[in-house]
């Protein structure tokens, strides 16, 4: 059974919740996230997950049944209609172009404030962050720049020059990224960068090759641009390159630490992707997720550092390394796209908070950033080892592939297990452990994605003890 990929309902909207739910499911079907024959969650599960009445869910499903998008099967559930035929050249079959109609909020998960629930993926431990040092950097930035940081800064659409220079130096030293500082554009996290790139590079019906399973929010950003997502298989060497005859406009990959499987893209695959992009005039978006968090051998070179044709766009964020509410990321934009990219960003925001940018520039320049990364790498490596040891001792029915870094571990369940059911059971017990199928377009082996980095050893031990009691039931 497929999930609804974290459908989000806007309670401040004038559109009814029933209408939003029906429209959201319809768009998931039209975009290919839900395929003909896929089973949908029950109306009870939808109502519980989205905090709406069951009548709202029932009425939305009934409407989609009447429109031919869904079909109920007696005693089995509700399925995407097997008779639906979608045009291969269109993702959103609306009467108007996507740019001419208001965009519905993408179906993203809204997380509660506060400490993360046990095993929530991709969460740093904020208790390790040197808050006193950060506050000194903020104070120093205000002392140096004065009230100028409190005003609009017209030339700073691409980011504070001091921060862009320090980010460029950091990327050159740590990842071999080849760029001038003016190619570094500061964004409010990697997601804004992906959304801007999708808007700039993709048109209706263009094909985007993405990892499957992979990062859902990236896929949604591409689909909202009108592009057609082509799922690419992931194996022990990472993303399989597109076939020689395949034509795609853009390839999206997380090569350092593929999300959610945790594998690294092999050097041969990196070179094959670059060769494909050069031969076909395609773009590669390299989301260098988790590249700093490697606990064994040093990371392989970034794709951008291997590219000689300027077809790789490098994307990153500081929120995973420092703290999640720091909404500062970056895109290293090829010269040929720079003016258009900055112009598009200007339509979204004049600039991001300048005090935080100035503080981060000083944090990088002072060396405090690198000290923090070393501290995190040591703590997270110990936690990964402890987590795996506790899991082995508990004899869980989960298979964990070898991992030498990252913030998460993906445990594979027996082939006949329903990982969505297990994820819901764990959620009911207070855990946040997404199903591997949540990140997949096509059927995949069932699994569960565990985050471990945000939790100190005593918390991990207690959480694994609770987890053991929940999983005592036979899988």
Model regions and ranges:
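N-terminal basic, amphipathic alpha-helical segments
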Residues: 1-142, 336, 342, 346-353, ...
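Active-site PLP attachment segment
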Residues: 75, 305-340, 355
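Short glycine-rich anion-binding loops that position phosphate/pyrophosphate groups of nucleotides
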Residues: 124, 255-259, 320, 455
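Conserved core of the PLP fold type I
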Residues: 138-143, 148-281, 292-293, 298-309, ...
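Helix-loop "lid/cap" segments that line or gate small-molecule binding pockets
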Residues: 167, 330, 358-365
């Amino acid at each position: 059974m497929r999930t609804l990929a974290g459908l989000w309902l806007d309670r401040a909207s004038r559109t009814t919740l029933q209408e939003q739910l029906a429209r959201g499911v319809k768009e998931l079907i039209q975009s290919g996230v839900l395929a003909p024959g896929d089973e949908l969650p029950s109306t009870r599960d939808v109502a519980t997950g989205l905090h709406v009445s069951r009548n709202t869910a029932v009425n939305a499903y009934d409407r989609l049944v009447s429109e031919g998008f869904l079909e109920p099967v007696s005693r089995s559930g509700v399925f995407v209609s097997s008779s639906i035929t979608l045009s291969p050249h269109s993702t959103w079959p609306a009467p108007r172009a996507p740019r001419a109609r208001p965009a519905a909020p993408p179906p993203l998960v809204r997380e509660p404030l506060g400490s993360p629930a046990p095993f929530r993926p991709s969460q740093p431990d904020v208790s390790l962050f040197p808050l006193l040092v950060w506050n000194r950097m903020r104070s120093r930035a205000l002392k140096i720049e004065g009230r100028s940081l409190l005003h609009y800064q017209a030339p700073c659409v691409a980011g504070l020059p001091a921060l862009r220079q320090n980010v460029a130096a950091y990327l050159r030293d740590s990842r071999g990224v080849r760029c001038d500082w003016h190619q570094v554009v500061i964004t409010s996290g990697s997601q804004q960068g992906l959304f801007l790139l999708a808007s700039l590079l993709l048109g209706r019906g263009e094909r985007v090759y993405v990892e499957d399973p992979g990062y859902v929010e990236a896929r949604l950003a591409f689909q909202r641009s009108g592009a057609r997502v082509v799922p690419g298989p992931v194996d022990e060497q990472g993303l399989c390159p597109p076939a020689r005859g395949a034509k795609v406009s853009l390839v999206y990959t997380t090569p350092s630490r593929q999300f959610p499987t945790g594998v690294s893209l092999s050097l041969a695959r990196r070179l094959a992707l670059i060769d494909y992009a050069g031969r076909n005039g395609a773009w590669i978006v390299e989301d260098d997720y988790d590249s700093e968090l490697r606990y064994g051998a040093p990371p392989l070179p970034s794709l951008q550092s291997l590219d000689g044709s300027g077809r790789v766009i490098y994307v990153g964020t500081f929120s995973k390394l420092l703290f999640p509410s720091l909404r500062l990321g970056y895109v290293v934009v090829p010269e040929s796209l720079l003016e258009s990219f900055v112009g598009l960003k200007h339509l979204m925001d004049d600039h991001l908070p300048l005090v935080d940018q100035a503080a981060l520039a000083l944090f990088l320049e002072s060396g405090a950033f690198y000290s923090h990364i070393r501290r995190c790498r040591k703590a997270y490596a110990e936690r990964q080892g402890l987590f795996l040891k506790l899991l082995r001792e508990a004899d869980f029915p989960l298979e964990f592939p070898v991992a030498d870094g990252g913030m998460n571990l993906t445990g594979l369940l027996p082939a006949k297990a329903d990982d969505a059911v297990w994820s819901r059971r764990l959620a009911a017990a207070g855990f946040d452990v997404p199903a591997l199928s949540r990140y997949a377009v096509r059927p995949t082996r069932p699994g569960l994605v565990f985050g471990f980095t945000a939790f100190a050893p005593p918390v991990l031990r207690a959480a694994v003890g609770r987890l053991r009691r929940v999983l005592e039931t036979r899988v």
